[in-house]
A protein has these predicted regions:
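C-terminal catalytic domain of photolyase/cryptochrome flavoproteins
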Residues: 11-233
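Long hydrophobic alpha-helical segments that form multi-pass transmembrane helix bundles
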Residues: 1-13
Length: 233
């Protein structure tokens, strides 16, 4: 995976990193191997630096190197504040989102919320163990902002789906997306806009939500907005 990424697939890394379908080929896909220690961060970093020196496509490799820096940063941060697995980093948020709506949570976990991209992402990660970064962030944001559920209610479930589960990255990112760090900008992803931006033809959605396979690309992102006549056809 590392060899094919550095020599071929990385060319479209920067362009496709946020797209749920294309990222499956354009991202490195080495995260599970880093998680389980099959390859070390030092090996990956040194190989990337060497490839960047020799390649004509330097920009995507520099972009990837920055992500490696982030990886190390968040793991080190977790070592310093391991309580973030259970507690809000900013305790001022302890008084909000205290109740769990089991119906909402079940729909989110099973990919049956009725929001196409959300459901496609959850079904995909449940079956394959992989999802690109932006879509992971969107799942966390949707749970905590749109469904208004405490992040703790969904963090463990999502962690169990990942082949590359890394506590240091997972919990810090989940808190960032839920807005409980107290220092990061609150991120609220519009799942309909994300679908149109990152999966415009609806390829990813139709693959994982076959119920929408026959819906046009124009309507697949928000089928609830279809005129009643077309929805019945």
């Amino acid at each position: 995976y590392l060899h094919s990424f550095l020599n071929e697939r990385c060319v479209t890394y920067s362009k496709h990193i946020s797209k749920p379908e294309e990222s499956r080929k354009s991202c490195s896909r080495i995260s599970p191997y880093l998680t389980y220690g099959n390859v070390s961060m030092k090996q990956v970093y040194q190989a990337t630096v060497k490839a960047a020196q020799e390649a004509t496509y330097k920009r995507p490799l520099h972009f990837f190197t920055a992500r490696l820096h982030w990886h190390c940063h968040f793991i080190q941060k977790f070592e310093s504040e391991c309580r973030m697995e259970f507690e809000n980093l900013n305790r001022g948020f302890d008084v909000i989102r205290t109740e769990v709506n089991e119906e909402y949570l079940k729909a989110w976990k099973n990919g049956i919320t009725g929001v196409p991209l959300i459901d496609a992402c959850m079904r995909c990660v449940t079956q394959t163990g992989y999802l690109n970064f932006r879509m992971r962030s969107m799942l966390a944001s949707f749970l905590t902002h749109h469904l208004w559920q405490p992040w703790q209610a969904g963090a463990t479930h999502l962690a169990k789906q990942f082949l590359d589960y890394e506590p240091g990255i997972h919990y810090s990112q989940f808190q960032m997306q839920s807005g409980t760090t107290g220092i990061n900008t609150v991120r609220i992803y519009n799942p309909y806009k994300q679908g149109r931006d990152q999966d415009p033809a609806g390829v990813f959605i139709k693959r994982w939500v076959p119920e929408l396979a026959d819906v046009s690309s124009d309507d697949v992102h928000a089928p609830h907005e279809m005129p009643a006549l077309f929805a019945q056809m």
